[in-house]
Structure formats: structure tokens, C-alpha cells
């Protein structure tokens, strides 16, 4: 479940802790928000992909392949300007609310309306705050349609959906309940989550520690890990010492000299 985090972690070392928990050391200076629409950098992506579910994802065994996630299948029309996704049934958010096509549509629209870091690639495909409500829609339960605003290779759009990790399903009811002054819940999602992923956020203290616990109702099956802890360390040398002592399982982005 932590394949993407490990894939993008850079220099990584491993030690041993109890088999049902994972302790990860990293420099958390750049971990500024947990909002998928605002995330930048691999550190936050590695966390977000375990709190949320995407429509589709890359196959970690073959990164050129796209595989189902919340969407079980998809097709492109003959005109190659419309992608239709068919959603998996029975998936629930951590709140207990069902994951619906309306949640997926709202989540993608939110990216363009907020116009934060993750909006840039979608704007390059022609999506905008003005047209996204028309171009991204759910014509019926369990169906999500993405209409391309301008000529693009739909295979490239599909790959972007799978690779970027930004188009994840947010629990729209929960987020909207925490909306302040039309911010689409951005302030609340900076330090909270509203996902359906394999892990739930328990707590986060900036530049200190972030705790996750497993989602026992996860649609892919209950994760083997009961707990994941991210701890902040400023210096690479400290990470190396913690690995040597056996206090960390993984140390992210260590300097080459410490590996």
C-alpha cells in the first residue's frame, strides 16, 4: 500500500520494528498541507495516496500501465473527446458515507475552482474554472464523464489521471460541512482528511509527527499494517543514526553519504 511512497522516496534505508506497524523518518519541512488539490512534492503525495482513493492508478509493477481503482472500467468515445468511467459499488469514506459519482465530480471540479498547485496540468488540457462544471459531470449514478475541452490525446489524459494522484475522491458532504467563506474546505483539509483510502489520519503536528491507522473497512481488504507513523528529522545524519539503532523502518531522502 505504500508502493508510491517508496517508489518516490529517494535514498531509503530499512530497519526492523513490530511487524504490524511502520515508522518512517523524513524531513517534514515541505509538508505544508494535506489537501490533495494543493499538494506539491513527493513527500505529500506519498501520504495522500494512502488516505484517498483515485479513480484509476498506475500499476506499481509496470508504471506504463493504468489499472482500475475506484473506477472498474472506462472507455473513450469514437470522437475521442469523452472519457466515461464506471465506478466500483459499495466503497465508503472513512466517515461511513458512500463514495458516489457526485463526490468524484465535485472533487475534480474543486481542483479547478481552487486553482491551486494541482490545477496546472488540467488547465493545460483546456479545463478552467469556467468550463469544468460542464465538462466534468455525472449523467447517472455510478458514472463519471470527463469531456475534453480541446483536442487532446485521451490516453494522455487517462495517464495523467492515474499518475498525478490529485484526482482523488473527497467526501464532499464532510468537506462542505467545514467550508469557510467559499474556500471549498481548503483550510480544514490542510490538517484533516476526508478520504476512503487504506489508512485514516489520526493526528498531525507540523514538523513533528503524523499518525495514521488502518481502515478496517477498506474495499481492497484490511491493511496488514495497523499503524503508520511519520516522524520529522531535520538532518540526514540523524536519520542514519535512528536506522542504525532500529528506531526507524524507513528513512526518506537521506544524503548519499549517509546511505
PLM regions: where:
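Short, solvent-exposed loop/turn elements at domain surfaces
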Residues: 31-37, 58, 63-66, 94, ...
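Gly/Pro-rich hinge or "lid" segments in bacterial periplasmic/extracellular proteins
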Residues: 59-61, 162-223, 227, 237
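Short, well-ordered beta-strand elements
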Residues: 19-28, 72, 82-84, 104-108, ...
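Extracellular/periplasmic solute-recognition and catalytic clefts
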Residues: 118-121, 202-213, 229-259
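Surface-exposed binding/hinge segments that line
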Residues: 86, 121-177
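Aromatic- and charge-enriched surface segment that lines or borders ligand/interaction sites
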Residues: 73-118, 145-147, 155, 239-245
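N-terminal lobe/hinge region of extracytoplasmic solute-binding protein
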Residues: 25-78, 109, 116, 192-198
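Bacterial N-terminal signal peptides
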Residues: 1-9
Amino acid at each position: 500500500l505504500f508502493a508510491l511512497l517508496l517508489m518516490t522516496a529517494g535514498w531509503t534505508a530499512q530497519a526492523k520494528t513490530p511487524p504490524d506497524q511502520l515508522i518512517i523518518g523524513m524531513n517534514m519541512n515541505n509538508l505544508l498541507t494535506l489537501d490533495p488539490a494543493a499538494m506539491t512534492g513527493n513527500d505529500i503525495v506519498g501520504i495522500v495516496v494512502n488516505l484517498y482513493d483515485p479513480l484509476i492508478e498506475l500499476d506499481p509493477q509496470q508504471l506504463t500501465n493504468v489499472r482500475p481503482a475506484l473506477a472498474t472500467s472506462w472507455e473513450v468515445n469514437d470522437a475521442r473527446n469523452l472519457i466515461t468511467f464506471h465506478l466500483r459499488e459499495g466503497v465508503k469514506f472513512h466517515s461511513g458515507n458512500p463514495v458516489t459519482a457526485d463526490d468524484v465530480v465535485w472533487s475534480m471540479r474543486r481542483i479547478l475552482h481552487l486553482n491551486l498547485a494541482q490545477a496546472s496540468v488540467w488547465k493545460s488540457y483546456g479545463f478552467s474554472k469556467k468550463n469544468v462544471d460542464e465538462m466534468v459531470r455525472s449523467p447517472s449514478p455510478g458514472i463519471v464523464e470527463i469531456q475534453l475541452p480541446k483536442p487532446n490525446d485521451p490516453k494522455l489524459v487517462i495517464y495523467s489521471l492515474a499518475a498525478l494522484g490529485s484526482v482523488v475522491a473527497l467526501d464532499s458532504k464532510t468537506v462542505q460541512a467545514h467550508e469557510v467563506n467559499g474556500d471549498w474546505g481548503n483550510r480544514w483539509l490542510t490538517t484533516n482528511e476526508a478520504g476512503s483510502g487504506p489508512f485514516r489520519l489520526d493526528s498531525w503536528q507540523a514538523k513533528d509527527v503524523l499518525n495514521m491507522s488502518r481502515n478496517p473497512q477498506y474495499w481492497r481488504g484490511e491493511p496488514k499494517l495497523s499503524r503508520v507513523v511519520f516522524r520529522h528529522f531535520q538532518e540526514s545524519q540523524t536519520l542514519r543514526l535512528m536506522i542504525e539503532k532500529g528506531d526507524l523502518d524507513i528513512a526518506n531522502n537521506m544524503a548519499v553519504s549517509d546511505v
